């Protein structure tokens, strides 16, 4: 299953360009991983979430909390998919979504979902570079009274993000590291 995910990422999510891409962190890179090509395609998302629930959580020693949540939009489909995989086991594990900015109407909440049902959460992200988006989500969860126990991501670009998140007190467990892809073409 993990090998199939790696192949899907290389085939559908990985891009190389002589003209560097601007990453969410603001950094520039010729190597771009658009994991939404995995998470927004139903059969690929299903495989990813099935792998996370059936293998990655146990292999990494990740605690099974009451929720999985992260910053919109990278985490959204992953959190929903994980929740649905747990429903197949008759377990309610809630998806939580962290807004980038609070709304100026309604409840003005940054964290959406069954927050009143949740005391602990595994933070989720698709790709980690500097860790800035994940740290924003962790802080918003904590401000909402939720304990972030650990984290998962599809890909660690190995550019310091894991250390920055660990400095926030959260250990991340990536499914893949950039180095897992070997010598990427055009290195």
UniProtKB/Swiss-Prot annotation:
Q: Tell me the Pfam families matching this sequence.
A: Pribosyltran
GO MF terms here are: magnesium ion binding; orotate phosphoribosyltransferase activity
The protein's annotated catalytic reaction(s) are:
orotidine 5'-phosphate + diphosphate = orotate + 5-phospho-alpha-D-ribose 1-diphosphate
Which residues does the annotation say bind orotate? 129, 157
Q: Which UniProt keywords apply?
A: Glycosyltransferase, Magnesium, Pyrimidine biosynthesis, Transferase
- Give the superkingdom in one word: Bacteria
**Residue ranges crossing the lipid bilayer per the database entry:** none
- Binding-site list for 5-phospho-alpha-D-ribose 1-diphosphate: 99-100, 103, 105, 125-133
Cofactor requirement: Mg(2+)
Instruction: Please state the span of the N-terminal signal peptide per the UniProt entry.
Output: none
**CDD domains annotated for this entry?**
PRTases_typeI
EC number, UniProt record: 2.4.2.10
PROSITE patterns named among the record's database cross-references: PUR_PYR_PR_TRANSFER
GO terms (BP aspect): 'de novo' UMP biosynthetic process; pyrimidine nucleobase biosynthetic process
- Described function: Catalyzes the transfer of a ribosyl phosphate group from 5-phosphoribose 1-diphosphate to orotate, leading to the formation of orotidine monophosphate (OMP).
> Quaternary form?
Homodimer.
Q: What is this protein called?
A: Orotate phosphoribosyltransferase
Q: What is the lineage of its organism?
A: Bacteria, Pseudomonadati, Spirochaetota, Spirochaetia, Leptospirales
């Amino acid at each position: 299953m993990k090998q199939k995910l790696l192949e899907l990422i290389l085939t559908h999510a990985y891009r190389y360009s002589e003209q560097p891409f601007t990453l969410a962190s603001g950094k520039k890179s010729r190597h771009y991983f658009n994991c939404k090509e995995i998470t927004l395609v139903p059969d690929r998302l299903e495989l990813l979430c099935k792998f996370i629930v059936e293998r990655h959580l146990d292999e990494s020693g990740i605690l099974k909390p009451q929720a999985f949540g992260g910053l919109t939009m990278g985490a959204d489909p992953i959190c929903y998919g994980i929740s649905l995989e747990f429903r197949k086991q008759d377990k309610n594990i809630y998806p939580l979504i962290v807004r980038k900015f609070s709304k100026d109407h309604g409840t003005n909440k940054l964290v959406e979902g069954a927050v009143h049902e949740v005391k602990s959460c595994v933070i989720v992200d698709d790709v980690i570079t500097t860790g800035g988006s994940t740290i924003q989500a962790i802080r918003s969860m904590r401000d909402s009274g939720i304990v972030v126990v650990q984290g998962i991501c599809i890909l660690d670009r190995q550019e310091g993000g894991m250390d920055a998140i660990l400095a926030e007190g959260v250990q991340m467990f990536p499914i893949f590291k950039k180095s897992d892809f070997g010598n990427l073409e055009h290195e």
